[in-house]
Amino acid sequence: VISPADEETRRTGNRSAGGRRGVPKGAKELEIVLKEKHEMSARTIVTMPGDGIGKVVLPEALRVLDKVGFSASTVEADIGWEFWCTEGNPLPERTVELLARHKVGLFGAITSKPKTEAARELAPELQTRGYTYFSPIVAMRQLFNLDICMRPCRSFPGNPLNFIRKGPAGSAEEPLVDVVIFRQNTEGLYSGVEWTNPPAEVRAALATHPKFKAYADVSSADLAVSCRIFTRRACERIVTAAFEHARKFGYKSVTVCEKPNVIRETSGMMLEIGRAVQKGFADIELWNTNIDAQMMWLTKNPEDYGVIVAGNMFGDIVSDGFAGLVGGLGFACSANIGEECAVFEPTHGSAPKYEKLDPSIVNPIAMILSACMMLDHLDETEKAERIRRAIAEVIAEGKVLTYDMLKLPGGAGVIAKGAATTQQVTDAILARL
């Protein structure tokens, strides 16, 4: 259902790149949009299928939401590779305006490529306009300050992809994994403050650091520089959110996962703030691990961990590591939460090679679990729990499993080998609702 205001936004919305080298509106412009007195629905979800299998799995999540009686209007918004190629902007202004109006988005997946390859795929008439490709999901997080990313990684009993280790006397153990990663979502190495062939003023600033002497004889043409930016406010928000979640849901520890023994300033700030925040949560232990050691420990004793908090890149890494213990990216959901808006998405990519398979074989569970996180955010937790129980029952029964759960290589032939289709998995979940 599309409201008249939303239809007008989609029909007349700016289909150009906004005149700013493909970069979406700045914070000041967005603030104005957020404050506009739009005709606003309290329950309109902006759906963004995006690219590849995003177009396959998002409709499956909507089927499940409808089955549990979730009442909302939806408006589909444009995002992704198609709009980069045809407009020079993978995050069109009309999509930004819809998110600013309705505050809640459900997102599928995007295709993202290096900037030189992206430039070659622009429409010919756009190739001389100076557009530079950017990740629309990263831009969305920064534009709306969706600074808190939650990535729960929980094992479903009976999932054949669950982590199993050798126990005493060669017996098999399947530890219960129940971890929630809080990833700082807008800063760090993903902030996008970087240069190839850095300009003279950047080089001059770098030269003020004594350790840059090692690069004094390297020409700027041979240098690439990325800045790892942490701010105290962002660290305090993500660490506090992690501790509050741990207290609310009964986790006994919060682990700061960084690398302060080497990256002393930025990782050191996160750990320092972790220690300060923990003083207000005396019932919860503060642990700290280095990212490299954490990747070892998660494959040794994953059940030891409850809530983990990390910067942008390390949070990305450790959450994928834990996802691998509970079935892989087909089970990995996430929430991007800011003070004004929230967007919910599976963490998998667009897998374009599977987009046009008919019937589809991809696993819709990560997308459906992301929709559950949206329900939690909207205080519809009872509906979310019903869906999670239905998913658990389907997995435990073991009769309707996608190709990844059967450990089959992808491709059209997996159905003949017993793999369920995307729709069959959703149907099995619906039957238990």
Which residues make up each language-model segment?
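Buried hydrophobic positions in well-ordered alpha/beta secondary-structure cores of metabolic enzymes
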Residues: 51-54, 103, 182, 242, ...
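N-terminal glycine-rich phosphate/adenylate-binding segment common to multiple enzyme folds
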Residues: 85-212, 225, 313
